[in-house]
């Protein structure tokens, strides 16, 4: 009897073993097929295959969580409907002919055409554009504009961190809401998680400020949506007339990540007046409706004010939103076209340098065909993974003649590109795969030499606070560092 019992247990264990083995192979086979049949770059596919075969079960789970661009079905359906509606709004905007640019420089012409074809809207004019590169000046300017707001204040931020200047912004927002100004905030659930749980948010909501938590982190949705898909835009809109965008989150650098020992974050923000704000607000209204279901679109820029923008010396701008469901891949196309458009000089600043193969080759080719190429990156960054992955690209860039400047004055967070002193791109997009293909981002393109000169002055100042990396010096680094670099290089398509 006892022998039969143990025999039955043994049979049961054998059955369980085979079930687990078959389940394991089914999972690996299923994930492998999904990787191979998804449209992705070869390096990305190879990196994922390595992960699931080196750490099979865990690797497969990681892929299901982070490897595919999944959104909830309801959100996908809502997004499509809203963006179709946005195209109709854009067509209405075309009736305001005075606000659109008709001529561009030879450097920018193809880029503006590309954006018009992909997004359905061409470049728009801006009456005034200022570059603000001092955080105190940025915050003071924002506070002044909020105090003068009469109709609406709308903001999108990835990070909203309390302390210092940010607390003053909260105070003036509450005052604005109390005097009848409509205030709407979209804050990313991950980047602003501490602020969203704070007492400040409760007070703001009581005063009438609407605050939406974008892409909510929910453990129940872990297999339905990528948790690392984030709302990475930084935008401020006031009265549908003033707009801000750039790389700066709603933070006071003196109070943000003080314990990381990497210095204060260095950013720029662009303040604009005029029709460009209407183009930016279409993006905000779509994001708001996707998150809340509320349609807040209203008439664009007041054409009665167009007596100024008819002049030829106004700024020609293009607002470029990017992210899932929003002209997918457009920002990658824009960056490639901008790099290939360079004839004399190309200056790029980015905190995270993990480019796609196409962008890497475009940068190297630009240098090899005689363009002076400068890349400014921070010497110290807040991500060990990105640090080593970035270093894996240095050799190829240096051999191509690209000058790499390592900024030592803090964490350089500015994302900017300047082409031949004429064409400028500033915004939230890092030179990494997450910004290029995953996150919701915004980029401002400006076709104006005076603006380019101002941006170049800031970039030149960054260079003065940087150390140039020389090929001879780089070639002497220890072999253990080279091994780590090559390891992270293989996984760079996933960062």
Swiss-Prot record:
Active site, UniProt feature: 232, 234, 239, 413, 415, 420
PROSITE patterns per record: PLD
Catalytic activity from the UniProt record: 2 a 1,2-diacyl-sn-glycero-3-phospho-(1'-sn-glycerol) = a cardiolipin + glycerol
Primary gene name: clsA
Family: Belongs to the phospholipase D family. Cardiolipin synthase subfamily. ClsA sub-subfamily.
Classification via HAMAP family: Cardiolipin_synth_ClsA
TM helices/strands, residue ranges: 9-29, 46-66
GO biological process: cardiolipin biosynthetic process
PANTHER family: CARDIOLIPIN SYNTHASE, PHOSPHOLIPASE D
Protein name: Cardiolipin synthase A
The enzyme's E.C. designation: 2.7.8.-
Compartment(s) where it occurs, according to its Swiss-Prot or TrEMBL record: Cell membrane
UniProt KW keywords: Cell membrane, Lipid biosynthesis, Lipid metabolism, Membrane, Phospholipid biosynthesis, Phospholipid metabolism, Repeat, Transferase, Transmembrane, Transmembrane helix
């Amino acid at each position: 009897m006892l022998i039969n019992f143990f025999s039955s247990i043994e049979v049961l264990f054998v059955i369980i073993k085979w079930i687990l083995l078959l389940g394991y192979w089914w999972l690996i086979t299923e994930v492998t097929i999904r990787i191979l049949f998804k449209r992705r770059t070869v390096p990305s596919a190879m990196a994922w295959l390595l992960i699931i075969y080196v750490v099979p079960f865990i690797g497969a789970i990681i892929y299901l969580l982070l490897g595919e661009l999944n959104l909830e079905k309801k959100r996908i359906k809502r997004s499509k409907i809203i963006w179709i509606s946005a195209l109709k709004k854009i067509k209405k905007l075309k009736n305001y002919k005075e606000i659109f640019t008709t001529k561009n420089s030879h450097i920018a012409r193809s880029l503006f055409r590309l954006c018009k074809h992909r997004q359905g809207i061409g470049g728009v004019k801006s009456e005034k554009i200022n570059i603000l590169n001092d955080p105190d000046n940025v915050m003071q300017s924002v506070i002044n504009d909020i105090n003068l707001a009469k109709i609406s204040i709308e903001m999108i931020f990835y990070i909203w961190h309390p302390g210092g200047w940010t607390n003053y912004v909260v105070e003036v927002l509450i005052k604005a809401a109390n005097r009848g100004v409509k205030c709407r905030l979209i804050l990313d659930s991950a980047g602003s998680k501490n602020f969203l749980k704070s007492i400040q948010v409760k007070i703001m909501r009581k005063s009438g400020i609407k605050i939406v938590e974008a892409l909510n982190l929910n453990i129940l949705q872990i297999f339905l949506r990528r948790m690392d898909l984030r709302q990475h835009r930084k935008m401020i809109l006031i009265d549908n007339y003033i707009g801000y965008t750039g790389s700066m989150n709603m933070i006071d650098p003196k109070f943000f990540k003080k314990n990381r020992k990497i210095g204060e974050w260095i950013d720029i923000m662009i303040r604009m007046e005029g029709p460009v704000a209407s183009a930016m607000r279409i993006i905000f209204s779509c994001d708001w409706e996707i998150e809340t279901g509320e349609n807040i679109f209203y008439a664009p820029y007041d054409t009665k004010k167009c007596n100024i923008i008819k002049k030829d010396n106004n700024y020609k701008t293009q607002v470029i939103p990017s992210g899932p469901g929003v002209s997918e891949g457009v920002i990658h196309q824009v960056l490639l076209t901008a790099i290939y458009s360079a004839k004399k000089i190309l200056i790029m600043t980015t905190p995270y340098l993990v480019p796609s193969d196409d962008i890497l080759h475009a940068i190297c080719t630009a240098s090899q065909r005689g363009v002076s190429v400068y890349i400014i990156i921070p010497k110290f960054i807040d991500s060990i993974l990105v640090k080593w992955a970035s270093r894996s690209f240095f050799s190829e860039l240096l051999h191509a003649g690209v000058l790499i400047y390592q900024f030592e004055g803090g964490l350089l967070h500015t994302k900017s590109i300047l082409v031949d002193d004429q064409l400028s791109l500033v915004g939230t997009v890092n030179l990494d795969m997450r910004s290029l293909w995953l996150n919701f981002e915004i980029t401002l393109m400006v076709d104006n030499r005076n603006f380019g000169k101002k941006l170049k002055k800031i970039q030149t100042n960054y260079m003065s606070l940087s150390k140039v990396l020389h090929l001879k010096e780089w070639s002497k680094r220890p072999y253990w560092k080279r091994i780590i670099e090559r390891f992270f290089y293989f996984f760079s398509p996933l960062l």
